């Protein structure tokens, strides 16, 4: 049986080997799989190479969403904008329920060959624990976010007379 | 008991302490707005305002980018609308800011002249200058996706701060004031 | 009225907790027997008060008392009764109150059932628990009080988040929190031992059942959380390496290391420093997790409504708890008696290796989770770390663990020879190699490795059990009888390892999944994975507070009927939110998974179909692990004062426990 000191040395060596393996794996993983986030303006400026996976986030530009089917599978094209540039995105699959025009999304994917479109493999729309969907009623109660999809804003002149129920009725009608 | 062995026992405490300092700093930055993991960063922050020209409303003159960039003092650009209830909520605080000497320029988003006039008559007019963006296209160029939103523009036209929420006192004290102080 | 009483009960509980902490920690120094007996009574009354407070909040939810702001914001009169009750903990303030309740339950349990622990140690343990309780209750009352009132009350509440309106909400948070918070007991034992300046074999024996209970609940909690996201989120994913999931995994990893090293403390009086540090670390990670999730520091799809002010309070609590305990550790731990002697190749050595690897994996997960905010802090760069990072780091690091898991139980204490231990496992090695070869030939490299590893662990666990009952070496009837006389902890350990192997089997199987997305009209069908999926109809349906569109899918295989599946999309009228309810069909070894995304214009709809091989095994494995832990707890050594009957004749030279 070896002395305590020698055994301690073995333990330290084992820890060292384990740690260096872990660090090496991490460095390798960081280099190859960190998905960097780019906005449309950065994409337009930097032209990431086709096939390189990254996250593209921005606002879904209103009136650019086109849905169709390709080989029986549903696909959607739309443009993501950050106000300075807009990138066309193609997504094959089922869009999340929170996806709406004029709202923020994050997509993961890569540029197609020819640098023309962003082929998205995932589309994410976020939500928080207190569900605050961006529709007119909640917008008027909380933070004033208005979704263009729900039609033109109500006339402010008649505003103060309406009760919450009347506002809701006029928005749904 | 060797010194190095004693130090080894203190190592966890040191690591945790460093982490704690880091967390505290992150929290502090969240309060001032310079770190926001949930946000959709407005891409304009740190850049110049985009080119734009907006007409005035109800007899007033609008403004455009050159005029804004030529200002010698910081300008708070506030996107609002008459049909937006929280805008009415932040109106008294904007009034207070204007009276304290802050230059506030307003942009009415997707609104009608009569409605704007009614709104300003009712809630007060804190705006040194007022323009209107009926189509909302300029707002898109600014990265606005709802109202109210406010931007702090430094002299020369660079956007240094942005908030996508009503300017309530906590935000004014925690974020806007430090941002303005950084400019002076 | 009742919410006010609830608030009062909460304040009273805080006062009791403060008293408990003072009396608990200072008591042993005064050597007054009466004072020493007060701490358990205080712990139990603290729990009673918190129980009443919690019940008051639940009552407010049940009767839809909208003067309580928490109820107005997170419940409504149209919410079904089950979710009016369980929605109490479906939001930040209510869930922190649940946290406090469970913390006080831990103290009450130690007070009521810890009679075999020496009085002074128990008193200190209760004192530490009281201190932590007091901190959290102060947080609730000061910054996050669920009993805050609003006037006038709104007519309707905002309603429970639709995604949370699921029986899972009733089950997942309480179980998970019991796991998280339960490790406070092991933590308190560690701190109390450091205060006393003594860690011995008895300490190991007392800590282990409390750590096992917490570990068991945490395993179930994580398992159930994964199952819940699997059937709720509609993508068929079960683990996303989301920061909130990672912060639940971290204490599980160190907790597993703790229950293993507590064994060594108990049997060999070794690894004391390590065990104390692990006990502190596990609860510290639980606390860190609470902090990270509720402060809003981490960007996650599970985001709790957060505020930096609350985050700051919790950070201070963390600094005091973790900093205080580690300071104590730095000063007192070096004085702990030096460990017993053993060779590197021995069961102790294997357990040390196990600890090292579990802790390294925990460190990697922690780094991945904290990398984005700290990179932003130090270098002002925004990045995000996702599943690919963890797949490339954690999965390779589990390989040595899997290999060692089968070998460790074969080794004897103090000094073992490796070759005989490995030879006993020949059967497992052979089957694993066959499985590996079979899947490599089909081109599935990752699945081959995973399945082979899983089989190795599963057979190793069974061989361990077989060795103990001397299967094939004594008459079968005697082996069977031995099953009831060997220590239950041994059965528990085998089951635990078996469960882990089964879970790995499921995870590896999921890597072989197939899926497709299609637009189908009624009458159309597609083929996937040997099954034929046919859309029969789409019709409206209705739930308690939602309207739905329900699709009917007929699944057949080779012409034989398999299942009718009914995926739905649901529209919740109160929040105007649309969710997807997946249809899952299981036969124990594979899952069929169908989601319906919405109608198209021609009477049909968009569908996503998946086949998940071996998916049920993921959660079955987790449950079996927890079952192993539960069986270990029934070991007679953990029961109060039961004499150990020496029924077995001791054979020599073999691995005994």
UniProtKB/Swiss-Prot annotation, chain A:
GO biological process: one example: cytochrome complex assembly
Gene Ontology CC annotations of this record: plasma membrane
Positions of heme binding: 127, 131
Gene Ontology terms, MF aspect: heme binding; metal ion binding
InterPro entries for the chain: CcmE, CcmE-like_sf, NA-bd_OB-fold
Positions in the Periplasmic compartment: 30-173
Principal location class: membrane
Domain of life: Bacteria
SUPFAM superfamilies noted in UniProt: Heme chaperone CcmE
Keyword terms, alphabetized: Cell inner membrane, Cell membrane, Cytochrome c-type biogenesis, Heme, Iron, Membrane, Metal-binding, Signal-anchor, Transmembrane, Transmembrane helix
Function: Heme chaperone required for the biogenesis of c-type cytochromes. Transiently binds heme delivered by CcmC and transfers the heme to apo-cytochromes in a process facilitated by CcmF and CcmH.
Matching HAMAP family: CcmE
Family: Belongs to the CcmE/CycJ family.
Official protein name in the record: Cytochrome c-type biogenesis protein CcmE
Upper taxonomic lineage: Bacteria, Pseudomonadati, Pseudomonadota, Alphaproteobacteria, Acetobacterales
């Amino acid at each position: 049986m070896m002395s305590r000191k020698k055994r301690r040395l073995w333990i330290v060596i084992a820890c060292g080997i384990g740690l260096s393996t872990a660090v090496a794996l991490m460095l390798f993983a960081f280099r190859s799989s960190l998905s960097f986030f780019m906005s449309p303006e950065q994409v337009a400026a930097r032209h990431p190479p086709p096939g390189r996976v990254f996250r593209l986030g921005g606002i879904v530009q209103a009136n650019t969403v086109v849905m169709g089917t390709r080989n029986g599978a549903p696909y959607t094209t739309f443009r993501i904008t950050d106000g300075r540039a807009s990138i066309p995105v193609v997504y094959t699959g089922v869009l999340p329920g929170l996806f709406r025009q004029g709202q923020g999304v994050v997509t993961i994917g890569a540029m197609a060959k020819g640098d023309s479109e962003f082929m998205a493999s995932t589309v994410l729309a976020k939500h928080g624990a207190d569900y605050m969907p961006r529709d007119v009623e909640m917008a008027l109660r909380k933070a004033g976010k208005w979704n263009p999809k729900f039609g033109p804003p109500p006339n402010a002149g008649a505003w103060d007379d309406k009760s919450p129920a009347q506002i809701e009725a006029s928005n749904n009608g | 008991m060797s010194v190095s062995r004693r130090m080894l026992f203190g190592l966890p405490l040191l690591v945790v302490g460093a982490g704690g300092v880091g967390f505290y700093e992150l929290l502090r930055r969240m309060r001032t707005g310079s770190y926001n993991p949930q946000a959709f960063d407005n891409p304009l922050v740190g850049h110049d305002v985009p080119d734009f020209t907006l007409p005035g409303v109800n007899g007033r003159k609008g403004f455009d980018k050159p005029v804004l960039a030529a200002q010698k003092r910081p300008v708070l650009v506030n996107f609002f609308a008459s049909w937006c209830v929280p805008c009415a909520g932040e109106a008294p605080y904007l009034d207070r800011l204007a009276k304290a000497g802050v230059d506030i320029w307003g942009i009415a988003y997707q609104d009608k002249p009569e409605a704007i006039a009614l709104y300003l008559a009712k809630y007060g007019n804190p705006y040194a200058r007022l323009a209107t963006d009926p189509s909302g296209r300029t707002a898109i160029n600014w990265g606005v996706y709802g109202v109210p939103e406010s931007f702090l523009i430094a002299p020369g036209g660079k956007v240094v701060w942005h908030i996508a929420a009503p300017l309530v006192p906590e935000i004014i004290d925690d974020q806007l004031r430090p941002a303005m102080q950084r400019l002076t | 009225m009742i919410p006010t009483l609830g608030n009062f009960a909460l304040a009273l509980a805080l006062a009791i907790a403060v008293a408990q902490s003072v009396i608990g920690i200072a008591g042993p120094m005064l050597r007054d027997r009466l004072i020493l007996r007060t701490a358990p009574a205080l712990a139990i009354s603290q729990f009673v008060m918190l129980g009443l407070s919690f019940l008051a909040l639940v009552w407010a939810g049940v009767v839809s008392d909208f003067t309580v702001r928490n109820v107005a914001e997170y419940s409504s009169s149209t919410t079904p009764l089950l979710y009016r009750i369980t929605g109490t903990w479906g939001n930040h303030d209510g869930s922190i109150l649940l946290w406090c309740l469970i913390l006080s339950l831990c103290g009450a349990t130690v007070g009521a059932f810890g009679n075999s622990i020496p009085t002074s140690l128990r008193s200190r343990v209760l004192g530490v628990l009281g201190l932590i309780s007091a901190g959290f209750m102060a947080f609730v009352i000061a910054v996050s009080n669920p009993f805050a009132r609003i006037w006038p009350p709104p007519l309707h509440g905002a309603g429970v988040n639709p995604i949370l309106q699921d029986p899972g909400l009733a089950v997942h948070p309480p179980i998970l929190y019991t796991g998280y918070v339960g490790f406070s007991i092991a933590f308190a034992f560690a701190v109390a031992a450091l205060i006393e300046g003594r860690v011995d074999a008895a300490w190991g024996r007392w800590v282990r059942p409390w750590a096992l209970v917490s570990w068991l609940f945490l395993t179930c909690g994580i398992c159930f959380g994964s199952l819940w996201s699997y059937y709720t989120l509609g993508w068929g994913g079960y683990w996303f390496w989301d920061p909130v999931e990672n912060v639940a995994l971290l204490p599980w990893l160190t907790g597993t290391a703790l229950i293993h090293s507590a064994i060594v403390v108990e049997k060999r009086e070794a690894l004391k420093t390590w065990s104390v540090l692990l006990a502190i670390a596990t609860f510290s990670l639980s606390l860190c997790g609470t902090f990270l999730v509720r402060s809003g520091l981490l960007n996650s799809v599970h985001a709790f409504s957060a505020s930096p002010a609350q985050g700051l309070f919790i950070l201070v609590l963390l600094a005091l708890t973790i900093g205080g305990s580690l300071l104590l550790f730095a000063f007192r731990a070096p004085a702990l008696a030096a460990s017993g002697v053993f060779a590197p190749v021995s069961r102790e050595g294997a357990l040390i290796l196990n600890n090292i690897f579990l802790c390294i994996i925990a460190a990697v997960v922690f780094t991945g989770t904290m990398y984005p905010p700290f990179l932003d802090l130090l270098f002002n760069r925004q990045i995000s770390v996702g599943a690919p990072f963890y797949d490339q780091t954690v999965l390779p690091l589990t390989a040595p663990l899997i290999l060692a898991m089968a070998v460790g139980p074969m080794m004897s204490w103090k000094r073992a020879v490796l070759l005989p231990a490995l030879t006993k496992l020949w059967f497992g090695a052979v089957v694993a190699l066959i499985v590996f070869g079979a899947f490599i030939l089909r081109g599935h490299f990752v699945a081959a490795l995973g399945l082979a590893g899983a089989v190795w662990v599963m057979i190793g666990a069974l061989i361990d059990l077989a060795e103990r009952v001397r299967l094939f070496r004594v008459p079968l009837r005697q082996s069977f009888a031995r099953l009831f006389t060997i220590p239950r902890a041994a059965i528990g350990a085998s089951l635990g390892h078996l469960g882990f192997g089964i879970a790995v089997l499921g995870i590896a199987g999921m890597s072989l999944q197939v899926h497709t997305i299609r637009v189908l009209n009624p009458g159309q069908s597609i083929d996937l994975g040997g099954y034929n999926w046919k859309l029969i109809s789409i019709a409206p349906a209705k739930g308690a507070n939602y309207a739905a569109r329900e699709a009917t899918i007929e699944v057949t295989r080779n012409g034989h009927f398999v299942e009718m599946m009914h995926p739905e999309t649901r529209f919740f009228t109160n929040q105007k939110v649309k969710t997807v309810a997946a249809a899952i069909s299981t036969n124990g070894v594979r899952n069929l998974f169908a989601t319906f995304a919405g109608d198209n214009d021609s009477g049909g709809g968009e569908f996503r179909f998946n086949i998940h091989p071996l998916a049920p095994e993921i959660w079955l494995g987790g449950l079996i692990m927890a079952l192993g832990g539960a069986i270990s707890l029934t070991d007679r050594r953990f029961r109060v004062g039961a004499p150990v009957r020496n029924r077995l004749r001791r054979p020599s030279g073999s691995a005994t426990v």
